[in-house]
Amino acid sequence: MIYNFDELIDRKNTSCVKYDALKKYFGYEDLQPLWVADMDFKTPDVIINAMKEKAEAGLFGYPIATEKTYNLVKSWMKKRHNWDIDTSWINFVNGVVPAYSATVEAFSEEGDEIIVQTPVYFPLFKHIKSNNRKLVKNPLIEENGYYRMDLEDLKSKISSKTKIFVLCSPHNPVGRVWDKEELEELAKICIENNILMISDEIHADIVFKKFIPLASISEEIANNTLTLNSPGKTFNTAGLNCAYAICKNENLMNRFKNVVEKRGISSVNVFGFVALEAAYEYSEDWLEELLVYLKNNILFTKNYLEKNNSKIDLIEPESTYLLWLSFKNTISDYNKVKQKLLEESKVALNEGSSFGLEGKGYFRLNCALPKESLEKALCKIVTKF
């Protein structure tokens, strides 16, 4: 490998949520953080150097996305996901979550229903409630460690008040990369019922099988989908607040833009565009090596649990660096599992129940860290369970 993902970097006291907010969120400071979805790997040097060059110029006025910026997003979608988009379909925003919240306002009214597939990344249902919409759950089905959509349940949940379906693709936290057939059937149901699809595809680059952007499947689906994405997860630049929406349907995009402007979320950090351009133009080789390292970490975790006859079950992911671990066969009392992880294993994981009640009994572990640190964490967990 050209890149050193084994490098141990001390992130404490660097004003990062993952390390410096442990006391606030978990009540303890002496925990190994395996929760927030960012990586313990350095951002590629080419991105760091581009930002240094920008910093050394000494000018930090209001930035703008140039023709190059738009074209790099377009070319990235083509070469990574075989998706042909037009630059006119792209609108930059300062984050996927703020943009998602804007879609809720733009395409529904107070009291309308929005469907999500739980367990799922919690802001996806949090912003439904904060916008005074009604959350409707279409829980995923888990069978023998594999999750699938329950489309019959989805059909039964649709009413005249249903306006939006939210797709998490790839899925956080269960790690599914949805197959084309699943997406087609899902889209068919939504289109037949005049339900707009919002597809959160922020983890699209961190995949271990072919990923299909929802809107790439057909023109009909593209005209009924607004996609949200960012280089933040891929290149560990989440703190630079640079994301974008992609939508072929001009009417939908204009409605989205109106709310984006109203909310003041169109201004991207001055370094955000710099990082995006360096990432999408020069950092693909880094990403390829990252994927190999992450896959090895996943396999290491699987083998470690098996070798130690652990009662913890890994839902092996098809995407993301987030491992969905079932503790259902360890201790029946969920609160005792949580307490034991904090007080005895001394690790900070995301509680499964925070992704919806369907996640109870599970915990999410971030494996985007050096193998040495991962092994240390697994040892602390397995010895107590």
Residue ranges of model-derived segments:
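Helix C-cap/helix->beta junction micro-motif
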Residues: 131, 192-193, 221, 345
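Conserved core of the PLP fold type I
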Residues: 60-188, 205-216, 220
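Walker B catalytic acidic pair
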Residues: 201
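Conserved glycine-rich beta-strand-loop-beta hairpin in the small C-terminal domain of fold type I
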Residues: 277, 293-302, 314-327
